[in-house]
Amino acid sequence: MGVVVKRGKHSRGVTARALAAAMALASGFAAVPASAETLTVEGLYPARSPAAAGVGSLVVERFGGRDGRELSFALEGMLAELAIYGQPYFRVVAERSSAPADAILSGIANAAVQNQPVEEDRKVCVERDDNDKCVREENQKIRCQRRIVTFNPSLRMARLDDGAIVYQRQLQERDQIVWCPDRAAARSVEDTVSALIGNAVAEVRLDIAPVYRSDVIRVLEVRKGLDKDQSSRFRDALKATARNPQGACDIWQALDGEVPGQSSVVFNLALCAEQRGDLDEALVRYRQAQTLLPRERAIVAAFDRIGARRAAEADYATREDRLSGSRP
């Protein structure tokens, strides 16, 4: 049975490194094989909670609970620095200010620490020769400790004009490490809680505001239907994707005129259009590619990206128009 350990009350803040690492994991680049040829697509993607993302200004209340103060300060800092297209997304109002605000973000946060006894196997020398060389080993059990830290804050955002709740969530963050007499704990409880708070802040950021994201998308490389010269130029385009993506797209455009309907060329031109922001052209090309490659999952993913980007841009424009009309 685990033992709950009480933590000290000394001051602790969320480290910038912990928050930055959490944000990188939450909205980083898509993973592709290291050797794959790719193009990078950038665009605005919607918040998970459109109602919360529609808020223009808000107050971050000092949260309750042992770790509420640290979480609320971390959230306030993140929201104050959050920018879309180089402009602040939220106007953060101090808690005791008389300035008007659209909504208030409140919550409660407590981290719990639990230690559990565990055993690990170790090879131990039980017999040595006259030269002190081990000649016989045995597996023995050693007693260790598993430390589990859980952090499950509850958050709520409500509009101040009518009290309507526009965002509510209970987050669940967890970390565990094992230490033994021959291996020290890799990090302290305080550092662990700080990192979990950073993870929670990163989750909230994705919930309540759109994100400008970069995705690394693999191009298609099948050259079926191309002659020797065309295959050579196709390979040149693949090599150019890293240093000269527009040059790669120009090569594929020329090949499309010579061999209309070559599946890789059609898909890659769709990706080129998506990369430069011509989403209408990208959709036309992806639909053509889908008739040639009906089982290609990358095409379905592209439709999802484009749909999300269009929704995010529409929501952003609507919000900006509404907030512009309410500003003095």
Predicted feature residues:
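Hydrophobic, Leu/Ile/Phe/Ala-enriched alpha-helical segments that form helix-helix packing faces
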Residues: 27, 75-86, 201-208
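N-terminal regions of proteins, emphasizing targeting and processing segments when present
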Residues: 7-9, 18, 43-45
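N-terminal secretory signal peptides that target proteins for export/translocation
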Residues: 1-14
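Amphipathic beta-strand/beta-sheet edge segments enriched in Tyr/Trp
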Residues: 101-183
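N-terminal segment of the mature soluble domain
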Residues: 47-118, 162, 167, 291-324
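Bacterial N-terminal signal peptides
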Residues: 18-30
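C-terminal/domain-edge helix-coil "capping" segments
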Residues: 35-52, 145-150, 156, 160-261, ...
